Amino acid sequence: MKKFFALLLALVMSLSLVACGGGDDATTDDTTDDATNEETGGETTNDYKISVVLKTLSSEYWGYVKAGCDAAAAELGVEVSVVGPGAESDIEGQVAQIEQQIGAGCDAIICAPNDAGAAANALQAALDHGIPVLSVDTDVGIEGQTTFVGTSNVDAAYEGGKWAIGQAGDGAKAVIIYGQEGDNTSNMRREGYQKACDEAGVKVLATLSGQNTTDGATKTMEDMLSAHPGEIDIVLCHNDDTAIGAMNACKNAGVSDVIIVGFDGNASAVDLILAGDLIKATVAQQPYEMGYQAVEAAVEVLNGGTVESVINAPVEVVTAENGQAYLDNLASMQG
């Protein structure tokens, strides 16, 4: 593969020299591009192609990330291609998409990996050929990547867990429904929830995977309710789809005295919170902003600039008290 790219690069360079009439003209073209970028205050005038490979496009949360990417592309005048497999569990499908995007040609690639190790192996081809690699939401952690745009999942889950424990009071018992096995984000959120419980002396009755889906979480919650009847006070969930699955299981079992906490800040979850349903809070990331900032960072680097190695995205615990304000702000960002 490396030999193929080397031959292709040599061919392109030789054709460019013929078209430009020699090395002096080629140098002039490079200078003109730099000058144009300076005249526009850092905004690109090049036809940059930026590929974005998300965990999936089949969820509300990742739709927000895509919307942020698209908004940045429109504002900065670049072409962005956003893809993702049908489910977050489809690791091989995502790897294939990464390889397809690199093979099709891109100036930078942004990835939210379903499996960091598998994604890193595929993204190495981009780094080997000088293509900037950026992570969004979940850190690929590959040596040489440009930046990670995202949330400290440990700290964010810790805040969500602390809020739930404060609402439940002394003697509460909890369960944790985490996401995909082996996923870095899932591991970090589970760690944050566990930390909050440990510090408060809250017993964690069970920690099981909900497979990042509503149906998977429903089945997991049913198993937890069967194993610990009448004992569960708090359900700490990997994301809002998981929280909705847990809520469905509780309703089916006639359980109403439970505090369910989601994660992501999806509008569908906030609507349930405001309606007084079993989901009482969601740890809201800023997915739209993360998508926007990732594309913005890619353009900055392509224009010859530099960015921080980590671009932190803020979080807040959304409850019935601040839910409507959160929804209003979310709507305003999406136009």
What positions do the PLM features span?
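Sec-dependent N-terminal signal peptides of Gram-positive bacterial secreted proteins and lipoproteins
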Residues: 2-23
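A residue-level marker of the well-folded mature domains of exported/periplasmic proteins
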Residues: 17-335
